[in-house]
Amino acid sequence: MVICYLNPQNLRTRKMEKLSKIGRYQFLAEPFHCDFTNHLFMGHLGNHMLNAADFHSNERGYGMNYLNTINKTWVLSRLAIEMYDMPKAYEKFYVETWVDSVMKYFTSRNFKVVNEEGHVYGYGKSIWAMIDMDTRQPTDIFAVREGLINEYIETSYECPIEKFSRVKVTGEEELLRSINTYYNDVDVNGHITSVKYIEHLLDLWDLDWYRTHFIKRFEIAYVAEAHHGDQLNFYREHREIERENDFNFKITKTTSDNTEVETCRCRVLFNSIL
């Protein structure tokens, strides 16, 4: 299997050409993107994965650079990240990414995080929708460039983590925190950026917790968009009573008219490290 080795620093406009189905992009765990344990923040890893997805799709002709010219865009619907360990400060690592299935309105994209020696830090899975920028409704992926994305589906490269789980809330969830949203929370599509939900949610635990716990798996499923000025409310309950380190979350937004609407659901699974 051939993997395309490309550095995002050297991307440039090029004639349309058939590239490999798998992209590989180098990143650096910059120290100001690492936590007090000297490891990369989960939020920054998620951001690197989204950047890799953007590089990969743009190079192959169905990314944001082209979609924006026809008033369409990609939006992240679901993301799951499962890690064995995290890159340390100043370590170089690669995010590999590939599309493993496509439907009319959604596509499935996988990730692998690995260093130069082949050590695997972890994997990710994601679901994306293509939407119309005016109506905000899903649009036909196969109608873009005569279904060009079909030429880049890779089904044999391994991504050995669990599929997305169902995040249930029972009505017994506890409100832990409410926060306001500001300029730095908003992305290019005009809504609260995907990674900000991850960062705000992981702030719900203090440093003492992170001294003895490692984020093994993080899942997020987006339900509705939140926008600048909305208040975000974080509700938590244990996923299973016997698993004290496994949590389900419901995040809602409170709008200017005091309406509370669910925006996403999350799961966070920790491993004890002591």
Predicted regions located by residue number:
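Exposed loop/turn and edge beta-strand positions of beta-sandwich/beta-sheet ligand-binding modules
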Residues: S77, T107, K216
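Hot-dog-fold acyl-thioester-processing enzymes
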Residues: R14-L76, Y123-K125, D132-F214
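N-terminal amphipathic/basic-hydrophobic helices that include classical n-h-c signal peptides
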Residues: M1-K15
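HotDog/MaoC-like acyl-thioester-processing domains
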Residues: R14-Y25, A80-S165, Y222, A226-H228, ...
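Acidic/His-leaning functional-site neighborhoods
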Residues: E173, R177-R267
